[in-house]
Regions:
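Active-site loop-helix segments enriched in His/Asp/Glu that coordinate
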Residues: 1-64, 78, 85-90
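Generic structural signal for hydrophobic
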Residues: 1, 117-120, 196
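Residue-level detector of anion-binding/catalytic polar loops
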Residues: 5, 126, 202
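Active-site core of metal-dependent hydrolases
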Residues: 43-172, 177-179
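Conserved beta-strand edge residues that scaffold enzyme active sites
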Residues: 13-14, 134, 210
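Short Asp/Glu-rich motifs
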Residues: 17-20, 139-140, 215-216
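His/Asp/Glu-enriched, well-ordered alpha-helical/loop segment
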Residues: 151-225
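Short, electropositive alpha-helical surface patch
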Residues: 24-32, 91-95, 99, 183, ...
Length: 225
């Protein structure tokens, strides 16, 4: 009734990807809400996939997407590991998979990831940024977004923002031990847009992060967003 459309991804942090039908490609083809695959990269909770593994999962995801007429997007949970986007750039350099078929997320996690994301955008890709889980995190994230938009070749046409809302948010101590779980709120999407506008970004540009740019990336331009 409210016009909300929901999609989902097959896979998980680990590889090989858990699936419903036995393969990533079949999941995307046979299960209508599935539009892509989820993996984790450069994170201590991932399977530490390398470039060749990204080529394999990217190829299967793209094929499934083409056959099902959906985005065929590999959403990459990015950690703060030393590998950064190296496996992705290897995949792009050693295959014919377009950059737009990979979406790294949590890209405000480190400044190195922000810079790597800018390189990806300059190659025709997109990257996603996570709205904060606290007021302080949200304001820091807005500041980082404004910095990114000041860089050459960067615009809201290739950046998206999501909230991780109601997904688990682990808390780690200084030794890297998980000491608890919480969750993020979707309210920080709205609050981040307000903060960006207060910082001087035009409203029509700020809301692209949540509307037309995700729609374009998902192949839904003119339908959603």
């Amino acid at each position: 009734e409210e016009g909300i459309t929901a999609y989902c991804l097959t896979g998980a942090y680990g590889m090989p990807s858990p699936t419903i039908t036995g393969s990533v490609e079949k999941d995307i083809m046979m299960v209508p809400p599935i539009i892509g695959t989820k993996i984790a990269v450069s994170d201590h909770r991932s399977s530490n996939p390398r470039g060749e593994e990204l080529i394999a999962i990217g190829s299967a995801t793209r094929r499934g997407g083409m056959l099902a007429n959906v985005a065929g997007l590999v959403t990459m949970h990015m950690g703060s590991g030393v590998g950064k986007l190296d496996p992705l750039f290897y995949a792009l350099d050693h295959s014919d998979i377009p950059a737009k078929n990979f979406l790294p997320t949590h890209m405000l996690r480190t400044h190195d990831l922000m810079e790597e994301g800018a390189k990806l955008v300059r190659r025709g890709g997109y990257f996603d940024m996570t709205a904060g889980s606290t007021d302080e995190d949200m304001e820091l994230g807005a500041e980082k977004i404004m910095e990114i938009l000041s860089w050459e070749g960067m615009s809201t046409d290739h950046l998206t923002m999501s909230s991780d809302a109601f997904g688990s948010q682990p808390k780690f101590n200084a030794q890297g031990e998980c000491i608890g779980l919480t969750y993020c709120s979707p309210k920080y999407l709205h609050l981040t847009i307000k903060s960006l506008v207060r910082r001087g970004l035009a409203l029509e540009e700020a809301i692209k992060l949540l509307t037309s740019t995700p729609a374009e990336m998902l192949g839904k331009a003119g339908i959603k967003g």
